[in-house]
């Protein structure tokens, strides 16, 4: 089997570090590996599978002779992804730059793997919240087409990067010392006001748009429709930042075309790849972010019918947004390309 030459862009960041961990854990096959980052991080030494690599500054020519390029995200994708694709690399991009481009497949491998090979050089990784929700939606959608989704997210501070974790830690220290909590980052760096996230909930992730939904919320709308190949699905999201380090949680109410029993949905979830059913109210068994952190599978529980609508189904789903919500999803796409020898 041919093994690809692989580049990781953003190797020194949180998602880049997760790429490296997962490549080692999953024995991802590669011929040569190149680690890339900004000029500021170039020169850093990183070890992968026992071999030390020096991180290079990312430039267009960095992608010469690269088969698969894993982009950890960020604004640099917009300029470097087309350059890498032009040089023959298949780019798997974790940024939002190309997600809604009709020429670019938006892929969750358990949900729409058939879209991977339709790429024209770039494949987009969806938003972390969309990926996690889609793993709960797909088994239900296969039983009866989804008409409407109402979702509230409980998103960990690490979704805002390591600065989000540091801000939460500092605020907890300030609060316990009786000091005023300082906030410089959340709900979003570009906002005119910032609020403490410690002992608090922030019902804003990213900037507000003209319709009073946030950019994060509208990502969930459009991306869900694209992944499930149905623009008629109504998605009504509220995204909330919570004082949790890692793993996003989501409360989801779905209306399907026909009624689906709890038993049928649970059975479908149990067979669905990447999903673990943790659902036993009598034993207080349900998914929690503390226990899904650093694991590959998402967990689904609190599965129950809508009290008033026979076509309605409620569930609670939790997943590690750095793993399945970012690095793992991208690496699974790369694994698919290797399996099909399509690079």
Q: What is each of the regions a protein language model found here?
A:
Residues 1-192, 232-234, 267, 284, ...:
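N-terminal Rossmann-like NAD(P) cofactor-binding subdomain of oxidoreductases
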Residues 11, 19, 136, 197, ...:
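General structural feature for long, well-ordered alpha-helical segments within catalytic domains
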Residues 117-124, 200-211, 315-317:
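Helix-loop-beta segment of a Rossmann-like dinucleotide-binding subdomain
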Residues 123-132, 212-221, 325-329:
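A glycine-rich, Thr/Ser-enriched phosphate-binding loop motif common to dinucleotide/cofactor-binding enzymes
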Residues 159-162, 209-212, 244-247, 262-263:
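Short acidic/glycine-rich loop or secondary-structure boundary segments that cap or lie
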Residues 192-244:
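Oxyanion-binding "anion nests"
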Residues 232-343:
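C-terminal active-site/capping subdomain that shapes the small-molecule cofactor and substrate pocket
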């Amino acid at each position: 089997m041919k093994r690809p030459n692989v580049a990781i862009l953003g190797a020194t960041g949180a998602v880049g570090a997760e790429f490296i961990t997962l490549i080692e854990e999953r024995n991802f096959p590669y011929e040569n590996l190149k680690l890339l980052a900004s000029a500021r991080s170039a020169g850093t030494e990183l070890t992968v599978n026992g071999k030390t690599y020096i991180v290079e500054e990312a430039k267009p020519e960095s992608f010469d002779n690269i088969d698969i390029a894993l982009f950890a995200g960020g604004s640099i994708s917009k300029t470097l992804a087309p350059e890498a694709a032009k040089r023959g690399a298949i780019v798997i991009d974790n940024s939002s730059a190309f997600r809604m481009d009709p020429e670019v497949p938006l892929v969750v491998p358990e949900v729409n793997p058939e879209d991977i090979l339709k790429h024209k050089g770039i494949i987009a990784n969806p938003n972390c919240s969309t990926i996690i929700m889609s793993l709960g939606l797909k088994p239900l959608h296969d039983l009866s087409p989804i008409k409407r989704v109402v979702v509230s997210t409980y998103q960990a501070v690490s979704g805002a990067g390591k600065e989000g974790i540091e801000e939460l830690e500092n605020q907890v220290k300030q609060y316990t010392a009786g000091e005023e909590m300082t906030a410089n980052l959340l709900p979003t760096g570009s906002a005119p006001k910032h609020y403490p996230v410690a002992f608090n909930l922030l019902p804003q992730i990213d900037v507000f748009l003209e319709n009073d939904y946030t950019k994060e919320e509208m990502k969930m709308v459009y991306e869900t429709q694209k992944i499930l190949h149905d623009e008629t699905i109504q998605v009504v999201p509220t995204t909330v930042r919570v004082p949790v380090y890692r793993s996003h949680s989501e409360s989801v109410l779905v209306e399907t075309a026909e009624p689906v029993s709890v038993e049928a949905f649970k059975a479908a979830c149990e067979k669905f790849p990447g999903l673990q059913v943790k659902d036993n109210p009598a034993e207080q068994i349900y998914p929690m972010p503390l226990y899904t952190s650093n694991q590959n599978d998402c967990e689904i529980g609190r599965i129950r019918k809508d009290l008033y609508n026979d076509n309605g189904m409620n569930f609670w789903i939790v997943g590690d947004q750095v793993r399945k919500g970012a690095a793992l999803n991208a690496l699974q796409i790369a694994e698919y390309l290797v399996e099909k020898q399509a690079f």
